[in-house]
């Protein structure tokens, strides 16, 4: 009986250690098509390789949250890290700046990555 209790405790301890593994998300911000001023496009923020799964992602226009944003379902890779795609329609121009802001337990403060229209 004591052997069973020890084995059960070791199993529980090893499972609880899975939550302790943390990986910071990789953030990629890009448009679906090459940017052309005045031409409708899609702004994408692909967030990948993160663990645990709790994450907040916002698309920003001139530092303010864009409200009409869609996203994929939370998915995981072979290594059990997670990934998501957030996207919205937008029409680029010379004056507006776009970015993706991500909050995750691995970041002390939210991380913001600007869209580079040349990418």
UniProtKB/Swiss-Prot annotation:
GO terms for cellular component: extracellular region; MHC class I protein complex. Residues 1-20 form the signal peptide. PROSITE patterns: IG_LIKE (PS50835), IG_MHC (PS00290). Disulfide bonds join 45-100. CDD domains: IgC1_beta2m (cd05770). GO terms for biological process: antigen processing and presentation of peptide antigen via MHC class I; immune response. This is Beta-2-microglobulin. It comes from Alouatta seniculus. The gene is B2M.
